């Protein structure tokens, strides 16, 4: 053994196990502008003090392990360790606490959501001393966000590409989601776009199955887009799902979409993974493609109040990794989403600077330092009677996506698209005239239906359809 090794191993080192809080609970710590800050909702096991639990979270998601190791003496733990700097009880909940943890920037690889999540939401979520753990929010410092490209294009560039301003964009997911041949699929796309929609969409689980291989779908969809554009004089698009079993195959599909002259492709970013998503986003930036993001699998991660990752964190991660649209829930449709919580992460997707606002679940002020914004996509169980509420809730910078609410029209796909476009134009005009969409929404739709038989038929079909269930994930 060399003298140097003897010194490191023998002086100032004491083997054994010590409380995490002795090293990682630092209530006097003043956070730095360059720190990544995290807010964890934690439920300690009975008998575990909250300070020890919070320190364990900081340790196990940064430099710590279960026992003292002599190699701690070979580095500066004070420089690299995470610190639990504050703990507060959760009002109305027994044995739940918000633990605030600060991470030094040196812990993370530049431009890698994958690496950031591997540390912050890695093994610590299986730690036995905790009954449950949920990451509620992250503060991404400008010094770190500037290492990411972010969305391929952003909201303003997309509007300029489409030449569409002053209203939400309209979309439709083609149904049935599985089983159509490529030609019949293309026909449905054409009918919806011709009827007045801006976009149609592959469902998230449409990849390249035996009933419809991806190349055939891309070709028939391209024909539908060019035909509908020629007939309407508007720029149209279809979210061609490039998600695949390998990154190489994903990129091949995106490249083919670009060769066809398509304006937008799609990716399932959680099932596909952040590494694949960032790779595709960079390709889209370099090649002029918009990128639509679906959040399939998110509810497995974010729906439970006491364990997992809140969607506001997944939304921030997507903005960093890259995407021009992302599904965000509807507030009024069939999918989970409380209004204030939803509007909180919608602002985190679209705006450049978002103030801390605990009433909407925003734990930290977030400055994106001019990173392009992401359009929220409201989709899931919505129809023409929801149009006024959706316009009022989400505003112009959004995509309102009606699948069954288009294709379920009694007269067919094109009339379903007409009904949605008429309803949207009526709501936008009424809002611009100063009318209150929240109070007068149904009256506005009824007035418009008097001169649109397509809208009148849609109103009759869906007049009794509501999805009234208690929200699980509330503030």
Curated annotation (Swiss-Prot):
Domain of life (superkingdom): Eukaryota
- Which residues does this entry mark as bearing N6-carboxylysine? 201
Query: Which cofactors does this gene product need?
Result: Mg(2+)
One Pfam family this chain carries? RuBisCO_large_N
GO biological-process terms attached to the record: photorespiration; reductive pentose-phosphate cycle
Q: Which ranges are cleaved off as propeptide?
A: 1-2
Q: Which PROSITE patterns match?
A: RUBISCO_LARGE (PS00157)
Q: Which residues are recorded with the post-translational modification N-acetylproline?
A: 3
Positions of Mg(2+) binding: 201, 203-204
Residues the record lists as N6,N6,N6-trimethyllysine modifications:
14
- What are the catalytic residues? 175, 294
MF terms from GO for this chain are: magnesium ion binding; monooxygenase activity; ribulose-bisphosphate carboxylase activity
- State the remark under miscellaneous: The basic functional RuBisCO is composed of a large chain homodimer in a 'head-to-tail' conformation. In form I RuBisCO this homodimer is arranged in a barrel-like tetramer with the small subunits forming a tetrameric 'cap' on each end of the 'barrel'.
Assembly, per entry: Heterohexadecamer of 8 large chains and 8 small chains; disulfide-linked. The disulfide link is formed within the large subunit homodimers.
Protein name (Swiss-Prot/TrEMBL) = Ribulose bisphosphate carboxylase large chain
